[in-house]
Amino acid sequence: MLKTYHIALACVILAVVVLLFGGESLSLEEWQEVCLNVKNHFLHNEELSSLSVIILEIRLPRVILALLVGASLSGSGVVMQTILRNPLVDPFLLGISSGAMLGVAMAIAVVESNIAILAFFGAILPSLAVLAMNRVLGNSVLSLVLSGVVLSAFLSALAGAIKFFVIPQKAQAIVVWLLGSLSLSSYKDCLIAFIGLSLGFIPLFLLRWRINLLSLSDAQSLSLGINPVLLRSLCLVCVSVASALAVSVSGTIGWIGLVIPHVARLFFGANLQKLLLSSLLMGAFFLLLADVVAKTITPYDLPVGIATSVLGAPFFLWLLFRTRGV
């Protein structure tokens, strides 16, 4: 039977393999030189060699960022599906992806800097707007979902208009970000994603047994001493922060928040006591694997969002047939 530590071990093994063999593989002698050079760099301030720079400044931050972003998106997806009692929602329902895309489009078209900052605010503000709209409309799950769909469509239209009017070079930059990419990863990006993961999921871990009760009706949750409206709003804020910070450094990477929670439920059931951690780890593994595929299937460094769609869409279709007994 699959255990959580099996997934964690798989993440570690895949990360090591990517570091060793990602791009061009290094010989044993070259690895010995890299290890010695890195040790001397930290102990004796020796200058890093070109191979050491490739490992430490290119491969390692990309691996770390893939793990962090994948965990944030998949964990956000499983929480969203639980609290909204809908297996077809993902973190981008709240307008996070379309809002981030609008922020990036404005950054590229107007200021040409601070892309991550505008992407974050573009992602977080629609989420707060959806929560405010839902409060006005009666705090129902249906109004929350519909508010998110409407706002996402509106923001996507605005971003599309900006992309239409800018020069082709800037439009191409917007499209590349829209498809999601880890090619320009840095340790600063890793820190941002880690902060989002920590701020979002430490509260969710502490409250996961209460969040389980949101899978029941609001009336049943109230009878068990849970305020469903308050708890659902808190969960959505946590999910929004984690997803917004992840999207701000990686672009919009689809399917992870939708597919991975379903895969995790096949092995761990619907109880968040085990499901939440397993979803985080599975999402981390999946995005790192997708990034490997994106780098190897063509001579070019494809946006990782293309790889997640290629891997995720057929697998999700298989899940649908499997659950219906087809």
Swiss-Prot record:
SUPFAM superfamilies assigned to the protein according to its UniProt record, in alphabetical order: ABC transporter involved in vitamin B12 uptake, BtuC (SSF81345)
Keywords per UniProt: Cell inner membrane, Cell membrane, Ion transport, Iron, Iron transport, Membrane, Transmembrane, Transmembrane helix, Transport
CDD domains from the UniProt entry: TM_ABC_iron-siderophores_like
Record-linked InterPro entries: ABC_BtuC-like, ABC_transptr_permease_BtuC
Functional note: Part of a binding-protein-dependent transport system for an iron chelatin; probably responsible for the translocation of the substrate across the membrane.
Membrane-topology descriptor: Multi-pass membrane protein
Organism of origin: Helicobacter pylori (strain J99 / ATCC 700824) (Campylobacter pylori J99)
Protein name as catalogued: Probable iron chelatin transport system permease protein jhp_0822
Molecular function as annotated in GO: transmembrane transporter activity
Family: Belongs to the binding-protein-dependent transport system permease family. FecCD subfamily.
